[in-house]
Amino acid sequence: MNLFNADHNSEVSCYRIPSIITASNGDLIVAIDERVPSCGDLKWSDDINIVMRKSSDNGNTWTPIRTIVDYPKGESASDPSMIFDEVTNTIFLFFNFMNHINEKDKYYLKYISSSDYGKSWSDPVDITNQISKKNWSNDFKFITSGRGFQAKDGTLLHCLVNLQNGTHVFGSKDNGKTWFISKTPVTPGNESKIIELSDGSWMVNSRVNNSGYRYSHISTDFGNTWNSKKEIDLIDPGSNGSLIRYNQNSQNFLLLSNINDQKERRELVIRYSLDEGKSWSDPRIIYREEAAYSSMTVLSNGDIGLFFEADNYRNNFFTRIKLDEIIEF
């Protein structure tokens, strides 16, 4: 199902940067950039809004497109990502902000939240100072789009890219009241996803430009130190993927979606890992043509929901995949 296509709106250049989560009531929420004057990223576009749609029937039908972050022209919000806090039933939707008129090239890191499954949203909250380090003020930094993760103890975890100072984990131990940033960056790494492993350690899976592969990074001390390796079975051209845990119907394993090509953004696949990311299955091809960023979630009926960019950023599809199409037990 094609959820966002700029061909149907003459005022929009393209929709990019998909994010999807499942709320505790089973609702699916998708968010994406609405890029108005051009398809350029935040640094190069002065009018990007964030819009959403919602499904209450596992993706069969969707609400109309609705704008949830919209600053005046000259100010842009981009790169949505979400975490659903199971403790407080709160959706956190993170985004990156730039004022092209007064502070061009300066990145701010913000979120809005919803306590009613996306019906209403808070005003933006600026957490730049909480999740930045000294001397980062003018760095090229941004919260990774897609989604974050909630650990077993309730800690909210997510990834932040700083092109000058490395990719860091950030999060909250008090359900979003305050935020922290990890001591040490993962290297190498661009847009990254974090998951908690069964032993409580953190695993970050990273896009690494110009390498042809993804990298994984594991920390057993909450981001103070990292053990990193090139994942030779996970080829990648340098594109944002999605890493989630499937924990439903007595099944518990990891899922990864990414582009299965070392040079071009084409052939979107899903792999699974039954050993906490030590090894990965052969890829299951979801889309053979041009594709790019993807975001995954587990639906209330046990299916996998995948929201992804396709066809040179013209289309943004949602597809539902049954578990037995990917994995055999």
For the regions a protein language model found, what residue spans apply to each?
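Asp-box/BNR beta-propeller blade signature and adjacent active/binding-site loops
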Residues: 1-329
